[in-house]
């Protein structure tokens, strides 16, 4: 059915049954938590693509900015990892993986970078 009703008057509205099937949790995450989960999941996917040789570091950054609208102020999905710092990024992803599952699993190449204090972009 989807999340919206499309009545004949043309004004879509949220489907009334949505709240019944997906009630709000009593405790909601903070804005910072939601932001981190969104940024980290996108950066992890870009890092996986780099690790698998699908895309270069520069192309991953440009693609994330122009392709899906990663916040330009953060420099791109890969640059964001450099900005946060690989060690901190990996530690926070490990915590997210514990709480939310495998989608936050860190690729081995990024874990190795974190252990040797490397960056994707040379300064």
Where do the language-model regions lie?
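N-terminal glycine-rich phosphate-binding loop for ADP-containing cofactors
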Residues: 1-123
């Amino acid at each position: 059915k989807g999340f919206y009703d499309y009545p004949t008057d043309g004004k879509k509205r949220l489907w009334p049954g949505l709240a019944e099937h997906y009630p709000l949790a009593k405790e909601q995450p903070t804005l910072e938590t939601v932001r981190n989960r969104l940024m980290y999941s996108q950066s992890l996917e870009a890092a996986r693509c780099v690790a698998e040789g699908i895309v270069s570091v520069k192309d991953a950054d440009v693609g994330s900015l122009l392709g899906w609208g990663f916040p330009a102020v953060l420099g791109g999905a890969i640059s964001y990892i450099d900005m946060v710092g690989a060690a901190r990024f990996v530690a926070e992803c490990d915590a997210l993986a514990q709480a939310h599952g495998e989608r936050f699993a860190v690729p081995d190449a990024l874990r190795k970078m974190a252990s040797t204090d490397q960056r994707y972009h040379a300064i």
